[in-house]
């Protein structure tokens, strides 16, 4: 199981991560994404569909997320198995949006 970080910690350390949104494009179109995140759907992440792009991220800390956390955790696990350093946002994009609401009040 991948290490999890809170949405608050992810927001504070956002510039120190490569953010990967593992949701499908239609989910992002409907709900938005974290500014600066790269979209690599979980299926492509697992099937090596974008391995060249991923290889450029070796040595960097990757932070994955989905809407609620489940797919983000799977994505981080897969990346860690492949030799990357990856964590996931506990609660996913939903937690991120909630954290952003707290900070804009």
Residue ranges and their predicted role:
Residues 1-18, 25-61, 70-105:
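Rhodanese-like catalytic fold shared by cysteine-dependent sulfurtransferases
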Residues 67:
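Aromatic-flanked redox-active Cys/Sec active sites in thiol-based oxidoreductases
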């Amino acid at each position: 199981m991948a290490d999890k970080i809170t949405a608050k910690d992810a927001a504070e350390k956002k510039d120190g991560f490569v953010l990967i949104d593992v949701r499908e494009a239609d989910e992002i179109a409907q709900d938005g994404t974290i500014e600066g995140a790269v979209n690599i759907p979980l299926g492509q992440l697992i099937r090596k569909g974008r391995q060249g792009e991923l290889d450029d991220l070796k040595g960097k800390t990757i932070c994955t997320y989905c809407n609620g956390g489940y797919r983000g955790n799977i994505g981080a696990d897969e990346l860690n198995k492949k030799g990357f350093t990856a964590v996931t946002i506990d609660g996913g994009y939903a937690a991120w949006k909630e954290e952003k609401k707290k900070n804009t009040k």
